[in-house]
A protein has these predicted regions:
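Sec-dependent signal peptide recognition
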Residues: 1-4
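Noncatalytic, solvent-exposed loop/strand surfaces
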Residues: 12-138
Length: 138
């Protein structure tokens, strides 16, 4: 499964450095001028292929971060990836661990998917560092 995620311009958006936002309350002080998206759809600034998983994006210091599953040397792996928030270009990738599904994987939360969900955690940003866990919380 491949999904496409879209981010707003970091010039207009404040940082969203962790899951549920800065204060973990799922809110922002920003105002959206156009709320009638049926009449005037927002312009997609960029998209990125993010194979499998449940990870959300975070936004910090002009970059967007998430975790994905990706084969590295033929081995399914969990990878933290950084995108330029303005252009969507990949800045870097960091291999976190082998993507393990031998303990049930996502089957615990989604019936019949055979553990094929990929990463389940969202990175966090603090003090110029990115913190990312694997789906095993390692």
């Amino acid at each position: 499964m491949i999904s496409t995620l879209v981010f707003c311009s970091s010039v207009l958006a404040e940082d969203w450095p962790q899951y549920h936002g800065t204060n973990s309350n799922r809110t922002t002080q920003e105002k959206i001028a156009n709320t009638d998206w049926k009449q005037k759809k927002p312009k997609q600034l960029w998209g990125a292929k993010t194979p499998t998983g449940f990870s959300s994006m975070i936004l910090a210091n002009g970059a967007a971060y998430t975790t994905i599953s990706e084969e590295i040397d033929g081995i399914p792996s969990e990878v933290c990836v950084s995108f330029d928030a303005e252009t969507g270009e990949t800045r870097w990738k960091a291999n976190l661990d082998i993507w393990r599904v031998d303990h049930g994987g996502g089957n615990a939360g989604a019936p019949n998917n055979k553990g094929g969900d990929g990463p389940r955690t969202t990175p966090s940003y603090s003090d110029d560092r990115i913190y990312a866990y694997t789906s095993d919380m390692l």
